[in-house]
A protein has these predicted regions:
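Small-side-chain structural scaffolding
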Residues: 27, 43-45, 74-80, 98-99, ...
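Catalytic strand-loop segment that frames the active site of acyl-thioester-processing enzymes
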Residues: 25-66, 71
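Hydrophobic beta-strand-centered segment that forms part of the acyl-chain substrate-binding groove
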Residues: 2-12, 79-107
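A generic structural signal for ordered alpha-helices
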Residues: 5, 12-13, 23, 53, ...
Length: 107
């Protein structure tokens, strides 16, 4: 019989798979799918961003830009996913970033 962690480990993940592992939910889940995971090396995650995102109404009207802090949060969620992926039982842990240094946002 497979353990929960073995059942969770696969090549690709859709949003239903991701929310089984990460605690985030709509509207703050900022990963839509994961196309590839190489433990200890990288994870390839996708967030589908459309003009319909609510933050585009005010950031910036007529010139929409995804807020940098949301890009950073997406990276944090992807990192947490990779860290949890490498655990034997990912459902018993949560990952949090306690700080970020030297980050700059610009165009």
């Amino acid at each position: 019989m497979k353990t929960m962690s073995e059942e969770l480990k696969k090549d690709k993940y859709n949003i239903q798979d991701i929310i089984k592992i990460l605690p985030h939910r709509y509207p703050f889940i900022l990963i839509d799918r994961i196309d590839e995971v190489k433990p200890g090396e990288f994870v390839n995650a996708i967030k589908n961003v459309t003009i319909n995102e609510p933050y585009f109404q005010g950031h910036f009207p007529g010139q929409p830009v995804m807020p940098g802090v949301l890009s950073l949060e997406s990276i944090a969620q992807t990192t947490a996913f990779l860290m949890l992926y490498e655990l034997d039982d990912p459902l018993k842990k949560n990952m949090f970033i306690s700080g970020v240094d030297g980050v700059r946002f610009g165009v």
